[in-house]
Amino acid sequence: MEEADTTQDSVVVEDTDTKQDSVVVEDTDMIVANGVINKLNTTKRLNYLKQRVKTLLKKPQPVQRSPEWFFTRNTIITASEAASCLTMSRAVCEKYAKLYNLTNFKFNDTKSTNSYEKMEDYIIKKCKAFNGENVFFDSKYTLWGKKYEEVALNLYKNIKKTEVYEFGLLKHPILSWLGASPDGITREGVMLEIKCPLTRKITGIPPLHYYIQVQIQLECAFLDEADFLECDIKEIETYEEYNEIKDIPKGIVINILEEPDNSETKYIYQNAKESEIEPYEWANGKGKELKEGSYSFIYYKIVNYSIVNIKRDKEWFNNVKNDLINVHKKIRFYQNNKSEYDKYFESIKLLKNKKHIQNINESVCLLD
């Protein structure tokens, strides 16, 4: 059953299609759903979006890593997970393929839209997390992305000349089983999603699983557009090489060297408000505030970046909504029925073993 978020906040907007001076909408989550925003001119629309951001900022959020936070994340589908619930069917992918002119796109009703995770593996992962197992492990790719997300964010702020607000987990105001953790939302109401790929080439086309992530984020926040920012960042070994770089963005990250009992790497970044200071001058100034030998400089350059604006597609979401609901029902069923989960887990393991044996046999046949 879909549960409604009862958090309400009044907002007044002028209705351009009537002679009334204004209309009062008690719940700003509903203003988009009721189509009111489509009646507003540019200025009034911007005012609404700014109010919408204020409403989102006031929404209560569980303290990160608290029992409530873990329970919420483990019992809903989040935007970054949604691609693991869907397949590359026409219903899911046709609009994406047309939008980016992917004429050779291959539809497949059984293949996951997340090339890194199949649906059955995702269901098992959610059940393990629900039961207290640690299922989230960083790779060199995720660590790189985390390391340079702040650099990309400051680049975006400087380009767009705007402020970006941070958010934790935003639950959908109506669909209680859906949530999102965007990288930020601008004061003008534009969602921001940041990716800093370590090896993947930036093409100007958002990969399918990230496009799905952004669409779900927009749904959860009831916003109309997002900027998908990708940055190709390379590290530089020496100051001399760094100093020779001209005409492309570059900078320095200060790496706080780990204490023996501290496994978490810490960094200090030059923020957007400090951008007028030359990075080396900034880093040396910060270094004077730190204990000698407790830090090092990491020089970097931004070789390439891309900002792709993605519009919210309500029709697309309606096409995939039932698929997401069905996966969520499976997750909650297995989370609350251990014996059934054990059967499911064993059946998936058996299928994988059979597939593995089949692949070995096929390889042997090819060798013969």
Model-derived regions: residue spans:
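Accessory terminal regions of nucleic-acid processing enzymes
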Residues: 1-368
